[in-house]
């Protein structure tokens, strides 16, 4: 796996689902659904905090306070991977080759009038399969509350040819910039 997170990648899908399950399995028992939902509004903070915790051999955050056992980081990783596989089988079926990232990760360019169901098809564009993630140059961030619905992406892309300024290229996706 190249870690590029193309829309065709299967490994990206498993990795992103694993990250999502790891965040929930690490934080949900301490926070509860309501506080985790509020915490989720802080951009990539849940992911950053969980990634930092995973670098430690042990932390009280890994222990599920709702069980009598004391869970470890490795227990959370193991559980999260199994949860991710089960979740993807439910969402995308049993054929792993069909687990392309773009089947889950989509972008839709929405218009304010498109929030009404009768006008959605007239004003909104998409959804389209898209690559990227929270940590790639082709930004494709999403929230825990709406997994894999791309909410943050590049607003413009430009290539400047400094030897020939007239050869400069730019593209802007639909929507406001």
Residue ranges and their predicted role:
Residues 1-177:
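C-terminal/peripheral segments of proteins
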